[in-house]
Amino acid sequence: MSTIVIFLAALLACSLLAGWLIKVRSRRRQLPWTNAFADAQTRKLTPEERSAVENYLESLTQVLQVPGPTGASAAPISLALNAESNNVMMLTHAITRYGISTDDPNKWRYYLDSVEVHLPPFWEQYINDENTVELIHTDSLPLVISLNGHTLQEYMQETRSYALQPVPSTQASIRGEESEQIELLNIRKETHEEYALSRPRGLREALLIVASFLMFFFCLITPDVFVPWLAGGALLLLGAGLWGLFAPPAKSSLREIHCLRGTPRRWGLFGENDQEQINNISLGIIDLVYPAHWQPYIAQDLGQQTDIDIYLDRHVVRQGRYLSLHDEVKNFPLQHWLRSTIIAAGSLLVLFMLLFWIPLDMPLKFTLSWMKGAQTIEATSVKQLADAGVRVGDTLRISGTGMCNIRTSGTWSAKTNSPFLPFDCSQIIWNDARSLPLPESELVNKATALTEAVNRQLHPKPEDESRVSASLRSAIQKSGMVLLDDFGDIVLKTADLCSAKDDCVRLKNALVNLGNSKDWDALVKRANAGKLDGVNVLLRPVSAESLDNLVATSTAPFITHETARAAQSLNSPAPGGFLIVSDEGSDFVDQPWPSASLYDYPPQEQWNAFQKLAQMLMHTPFNAEGIVTKIFTDANGTQHIGLHPIPDRSGLWRYLSTTLLLLTMLGSAIYNGVQAWRRYQRHRTRMMEIQAYYESCLNPQLITPSESLIE
């Protein structure tokens, strides 16, 4: 429920944010020039200023209604005030003007960067290199209400007298009659190739793409509740990055280019360096700014009438027949090698994170099997499973009766601490062979007999038979002593168990002392000869306890060793059959866990506990289900089948997504790495190729007759 609430809240927040962005964008579309003066200060328009502006606009409308010298009325200009006109923008900027052929008394067009503004004509004389300007919004062009300290309030009378004066029509020029004429041929938008030169190199977009790769990686290791949000954010970042790299520029972002015709001239002193010479060329009063690599080729157009395309900031984009930034980008594309390097490095980073942080074996196997078309196999007998033809990637469901495998030292198991030790029920031996018998051990029987004989004599029960009278036994117990009424039996059982010379050394020494014998061999001979029959030994309680502990300590190694040996003897299944192994160590049997692990029992109890486990797990029902991850046959002919638990829907998508991300990162690293290297090599030679192209166009090499002959 909380997830749904969070989702709805996030959806509402995104909707509100999208609505606000649309509103801001629509407002900026209505005022597209606002972004050009983002650093301008603002204030409110005073009532006196508004009255002066209204009077000026009224007088301007009257002037525009007067027919020009050709008899035609001037084109109407909508300079009506609107709701945004109360905000005054104050900035310091250069003003550029162009002349046009028209009957309009105000024949000049004024620009602040790429934004055309309406400047009252009587203020032209106050234009400087840097101007303090105040603007207000109108329905069409921004209106200048103050220029370098001169305001409309002070010059309303001058405005009316100037606006009513007839102005002769001339050709378009920069300085009118005082300068050479410049013809404005056309005003166009820059081409995509010209825009590419001022477009960012795509580093920000490359970083967005790398960030989306990282978010896709984190989708694989985060809880399911966060995956949709991370995946959605990653898709948005990836889309934004790809859109920034490959989307065509918006029409509003294309700058205006003025196509002019005139005579460029160089104004400067002798002795100037190359950089100064390229920056002192003017077209009328327009100081042209050329690309640095054009410096050797612009001299031939000086003093001649030439077509020149420039931005409003006076940067030249085309001159004459051959010099063209558009043709440069078209014939010698820009090589953005750095963004390819960033994407390749980000792809390698995510690739290494996948290799070191996420197990890739199962996702790759599952994806390959899914692509090949895996089958589902169900089997209840060994023959049925053998005939099914199991392959890696198949879904396997089997049930039957088998034996839990015995874990041996040096073998790998996914389950590190099985409750059924030494049995491992995450590995099932399944075949048609007859079940193995329960393990038996003669040494364990001998150790048990010795332990029982000592316990019977040290801790007698009333119903036990004894070689001494009941009255004597009672008297001995009252005195606090302990009676061994069959000492010879203990000696014989010890000799039977501890046949080796180094076995039970401490126990043998204790029995030699109790029997007042020279050594162990002599004591055993006496016992075998029957000389110890009827010999009773009295022990103090401390000595009796010591003897009991010695017997327990001496028999423990035999029982422990025999338990391990019996377990290993079970690790020899019949040839053939199957060994079903769980990759995650899950038990395939439904048996109650023992109260304690086998090796947590005292040594004297381990054998009995082991026999109970063997009786339960050597022939036990099991159910195994999962996806086959590995199949191989060992030297014994047993087919090993590894099973991975069947993942849920979320797990399936994680497997597929892991493989897809791995392949995508590998492909991205290779492609962008190769592209970065190739683009870097081309970037190094691009400028030389452009200069060679201009050299061949402007200074063609003529082929001499001797060179054209075919030998």
Swiss-Prot record:
It is a multi-pass membrane protein. GO terms for cellular component: plasma membrane. Signal peptide: none annotated. GO terms for biological process: cellular response to cell envelope stress; regulation of phosphorelay signal transduction system. The keyword Cell inner membrane applies. Its main location: membrane. Pfam families: IgaA (PF07095). Residues 1, 361-655 are periplasmic. GO terms for molecular function: phosphorelay response regulator activity. Residues 23-204, 247-339, 677-711 are cytoplasmic. Keywords: Cell inner membrane, Cell membrane, Membrane, Transmembrane, Transmembrane helix. It is found in: Cell inner membrane. The chain crosses the membrane at residues 2-22, 205-225, 226-246, 340-360, 656-676. Belongs to the IgaA family. This is Putative membrane protein IgaA homolog. The lineage of its organism: Bacteria, Pseudomonadati, Pseudomonadota, Gammaproteobacteria, Enterobacterales.
